[in-house]
Amino acid sequence: GDVYKRQMIECFKIQLLALPLKVSPFDVRESYVLKRITGLSEWFCLNPTIIVADPFLFVDKDRLYLFYESKRLLTPGVIMMTSTIDLKHWTKPLVVLKEKFHLSFPWVFTDAGKVYMVPETGTDGSIRVYEATDDTLTRWKLKRKLIELPPGNVMNMGYSDSSIYKKDGIYYLMTTVQYEDDINTLELYYSDSLMGKYVKHPLSPIVHSQNVGRNAGSLQKINGKLYRFSQNCVFRYGDNVHVSEITRLTTTEYQEHLVKENIYSSEIPFYNEGGHQFNMVKFKEQWIVATDAKEYHYLLYARIMNKLKRFLMCFRFPDFG
């Protein structure tokens, strides 16, 4: 039950799926499993990897790249990458981006012939864009902070799961924040250039909802239709993924409607506890879909380390906790 889960550590794992192009990429029941990545392999490690999540796929020439968040129990998340040319043999996963603060949601894209990444950097109070500095996509440099938290503007959660969609020469940026009510609030900005000044859309916030207010991947155009994936957070964080079709997107208009709820079927054991990411590409004449899923583990030493960390914080800062 829920009481038992509160005594456990919430973890995430990744699963890559393949589907025929004739099948809807939203129907994971028609897929077969390509690859899985899990944490918790270092059973005797004091700082084990507990989260591998937020997978994003990116195709460059004949190579498929998988970027994802990897987080250990006591340290902030970093961005890792692995790649393949045949879907069978994958390169050794490498840390490609690390900061002093938490990183996740590594959305990778191209613009004007260059490769960029917009990871989640909300704990820094900003939305950042990094540029790849080599052809292997293993090195990245900060190019610009697109948006920064205004002075004195207090959010309970700032700038999460951000991505950009270019349409008719305009760059539309979506990001999720939470204000005093702790409800997921989807904000929309736009600019006439990737590195330009982003102004808030007149209809922003465009969504205020625990059901569809937080993105679960980037916007994707499939068979001529533009889709947005969102997390179901009604009962708990990252419970499942919904799909909405965006029917109007201009500098003055925005419309979307829900087309599919709960992509992850509870009939599939891997997704028993839900998931919060959905991303796809066409590669080798099929759909390749990146998903993640939640799981819970009772790690005694992890609970001890958490309590020790809290004790040390209280000792150093008497008012803590």
Where are these regions (language model features)?
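Blade-level signature of beta-propeller repeat domains, shared across WD40, Kelch, NHL, RCC1
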Residues: 235, 240-249, 268-312
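Short loop/turn segments that connect beta-strands within beta-propeller blades
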Residues: 84-88, 133-137, 192-195, 247-249
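Short, small-residue-biased leader/transition segments that mark boundaries at the very start
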Residues: 1-4
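Loop/turn-rich, solvent-exposed surfaces of beta-rich toroidal or solenoidal domains
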Residues: 170-191, 211-246
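Structural motif
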Residues: 9-25, 74-82, 124-131, 181-190, ...
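Surface loop/turn signatures of beta-propeller and other carbohydrate-active proteins
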Residues: 15-58, 73-74, 88-110, 119, ...
